[in-house]
A protein has these predicted regions:
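Cytochrome P450
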Residues: 1-378
Length: 378
């Protein structure tokens, strides 16, 4: 288990560290291996296969080939957030998880991928089961297998439909891709769809919920954010450091004997990277347990390269693929909450948490308020 910033960064960039669970020796059991019956997604692959699959998907998600996929979503995001907060009007208390933090990223990733929004109740059940594979103690192998099979059937139908009648979404683009990297097989399309759907919402929900909770615990920061909307960029960056949605990465393996911090990690052993601890390493940041968005003020401290300051999105070749989208969603949701909720306060502190050890965030977050400021459109 590695918990210090410098060593984690070193290992994230070390080619002798694999993300493929097949490299584990038998003694290191209990590591999630992805979805049973499907090939690993690129999250669980090493170069060169990782790089090829990531490049294929990137072509349809980010500049230079697809410059507007994320940026072009900004107006739609504002509309979705505005609509969800409009739903709070006339009430004095809401569950931020169920009524904003979860429905927002679900709506966005469905639209992006071309998954019908009304199918959420179906895939929600499968995803809940699949996430249990992150926690080997639940003993849910049969449930995980069943959920994987049902979700694969569902996505097979969806991919075939998009191939026959392609739209402007990512599943259509991936299913009909004839770019320089060659086509994805049907199995690769399935594992990529699973990865994007799950990574695309199960993490962002925690960033928005952890963010709301943290801001309500620091009312002076919330008040500053209300008066200075530009501050939201720093707030989200500091949240990724201070209350990250992904606490640790449990699926790395040493491909060789690796010397680090006067310790030898033997070949074949499992390496757990404690990203959240690394982001609070006192040798890396000043006063690490203080929530202080100003530490990301570029005018005061000169923000270095993306990802340099915290490990919220990991690092190296597996650096979060969806980081620009996650940032935009959290900035929009938290900015609008700060602007529109009048006198917001926590009803229960601490709130009940999800039981997942990797993905950390509240299961529910009851927030009371006096009124709702009308939306800009209103
Ligand atoms: C606040 C929200 C998010 C957080 C905190 C987060 C965090 C992370 C982290 C820590 C990793 C690295 C895992 C590793 O090193 O093994 C990662 C990888 C990844 N994330 Fe995110 N993520 C978020 C949102 C998203 C979104 C919205 C998407 C999709 C649109 C996404 C897609 C991915 C993918 C595909 C990978 C695998 C990248 C690779 O293996 O090359 N993530 N994410």
């Amino acid at each position: 288990m590695v918990s210090t910033y410098r060593e984690i960064v070193e290992l994230l960039h070390d080619p002798r560290v694999s993300s493929d669970p097949r490299n584990l020796t038998a003694s290191a059991a209990g590591v999630p291996e992805g979805v049973p019956g499907l090939p690993a997604s690129f999250l669980h692959l090493d170069p060169p296969e990782h790089d090829r699959l990531r490049r294929v998907v990137t072509r349809h998600f980010r500049p230079p080939h697809t410059p507007d996929r994320v940026d072009g979503l900004a107006p739609e995001l504002h509309k979705i957030v505005g609509g969800l907060i409009d739903g709070f009007v006339g009430r004095t208390e809401v569950d931020i998880v169920d009524e904003l933090a979860y429905p927002l990223p679900v709506a966005v990733i469905c639209q992006l991928l071309g998954v019908p929004r009304e199918d959420e109740p179906r895939f929600h059940v499968w995803v809940e089961s699949l996430l249990k594979s992150l926690d080997p103690d639940t003993g849910a192998a049969a449930e995980v297998q069943q959920a994987g099979t049902e979700m694969a059937q569902y996505f097979s139908g969806l991919i075939d439909a998009h191939r026959r009648a392609p739209g402007g979404d990512m599943l259509s683009a991936l299913a009909t891709d004839d770019g320089p990297e060659g086509q994805l097989t049907q199995e690769q399309l399935l594992s990529t769809s699973f990865l994007l759907l799950i990574a695309g919402h199960e993490t962002t929900v925690n960033l928005i919920a952890n963010g709301t909770l943290t801001l309500l615990r620091h009312p002076h920061v919330l008040e500053r954010l209300r008066r200075d909307p530009e501050m939201v960029f720093r707030v989200v960056e500091e949240l990724l450091r201070y209350e990250p949605p992904v606490h640790f990465v449990p699926w790395r393996t040493a491909l060789d004997d690796i010397e680090i911090a006067d310790t030898t990690m033997p070949k074949g052993s499992r390496i757990v990277l404690l990203l959240a601890a690394g982001s609070r390493d006192p040798d890396h940041v000043r006063a690490p347990d203080r929530f202080d968005p100003d530490r990301f003020d570029p005018d005061r401290f000169g923000l270095a390269r993306e990802g340099d300051q915290h490990l919220g999105f990991g690092g190296g070749i597996h650096y979060c693929f969806g980081a620009p989208l996650a940032r935009l969603e959290a900035q929009t949701a938290l900015g609008e909450l700060a602007r529109r909720l009048v006198n917001p306060r926590l009803v229960t502190d601490p709130p009940p948490y999800r039981t997942n050890p990797v993905l950390r965030g509240p299961r529910h977050l009851q927030v009371a308020f006096d009124d709702i400021v009308p939306s800009r459109e209103g």
